[in-house]
Amino acid sequence: MSEFLVNLLGERLVNGEKAEVDVQALGSRLSLLGLYFGCSLNGPCKQFNASLTEFYSKFKKSSEHKDKLEIVFISSDQDQKQWQDFLQEMQWPALPFKDRHKKMKLWNKYKVTSIPSLVFIDAATGKVVCRNGLLVVRDDPKGLEFPWGPKPFAEVVSGPLLRNNRQTTDSTALEGSYVGVYFSAHWCPPCRSLTRVLVESYRKVKETGQKFEIVFVSADRSEESFTQYFSEMPWLAVPYSDEARRSRLNRLYGIQGIPTLILLDTEGHMITRQGRVEILNDPDCGLFPWHPRPVLELSESNAVQLHEGPCLVLFVDAEEEGELDPAKELIQPIAEKIMAKYKAKEEETPLLFFVAGEDDMSDSLRDYTNLPEAAPLLTILDMSARAKYVKDVEEITPAVVEQFVSGFLAEKLKPEPI
């Protein structure tokens, strides 16, 4: 356990009194670690920091598990004094200010997209236990549900579900169906746009006779808004009044932003968190139930994934439909290998794979990342770290791709700034 945490965090952390904290000694007693991503200049972070301090203080005083949990602050501060001042308000240690490389690795590894964020992980393996610790602090202020591990979807969603004619059905009606858990709200323009597309996709899948259902989990700000929005939807919803169940579903899937569409198989296991991208990329619904594909063709609808972690992008000279197929076939084996390896470990893949042809999206990405115009061009782009890795060779072979990917995952490649 200690060795894993040393690899993850380094040998030393620091606390608000500028004292060092030995990670190996810390790891010898822990079972759960909370990674708290934040910034002193962020208003919501300051508010959450106060709540977390109260939660942490109560837990350490009264919980029978008080020695099994620790929090580590991962800062996005750019000014060391501001970071130090903020750290003095905390009762837990932090990653050293200078250790920016480890900070970015943690952001990428745990798919953090916003702050404040609190991710609880198994201290022995690093596996995510709970992605949305903010809701743990809000909903379980005494820490009675420690260690906040995931529960089966059927258990969390259990209870009556609404139809937009105000009739209800029990959640057991979902048994044996593929399910989309749709986190959305009327006040959010991207949500409303996705809902229009999703209504058509839902209709098309149902017409094929497939057992498919969607459950709307509202983030609306009033029941009136919920009712208005839900009237556009032909599927089911968690009642707006059942705030506790809505919150538990948000916690279960670590929702950090909307719209989010989680797709589940008939056993309630997750197929993908990227239901939004899958739906937009497959208007004919021919790929239902939308299992993740090892290699994607870069498009406007899936470009959002470039900001969710490191991505390998192979740029090629292709303009017509079908011309990208040889490029996809080139990187498919290594993409499948990486996907299978991390699926077996029940971890998210550390690298997504794209091919990009000659179009406006590709041109925009090249311009933004200041890439050469060469084609083919093999790259790994890490937007959150503002770093790129470029393999500019005359011939790109499977061996070249595998060596490039292996070097990146082993941290042997030297990044260039974006």
UniProtKB/Swiss-Prot annotation:
GO MF terms, alphabetically ordered: thioredoxin-disulfide reductase (NADPH) activity
Enzyme class at the top of the EC tree: oxidoreductase
EC annotation from Swiss-Prot or TrEMBL: 1.8.1.8
InterPro entries to which the protein is assigned, alphabetical: Thioredoxin-like_fold, Thioredoxin-like_sf, Thioredoxin_domain, TryX_NRX_thioredoxin_dom
Domain Thioredoxin as annotated: residue spans: 109-309
Principal subcellular localisation of the protein: cytoplasm
Keyword Transmembrane belongs to the record: no
Biological processes, Gene Ontology terms: cell differentiation; circulatory system development; negative regulation of protein ubiquitination; negative regulation of Wnt signaling pathway; Wnt signaling pathway
Any single Pfam family the record assigns to this protein: Thioredoxin_8
Subcellular location, record wording: Cytoplasm, Cytosol; Nucleus
Reaction(s) this enzyme catalyzes, per UniProt: [protein]-dithiol + NAD(+) = [protein]-disulfide + NADH + H(+); [protein]-dithiol + NADP(+) = [protein]-disulfide + NADPH + H(+)
Task of the protein: Functions as a redox-dependent negative regulator of the Wnt signaling pathway.
Protein name: Nucleoredoxin
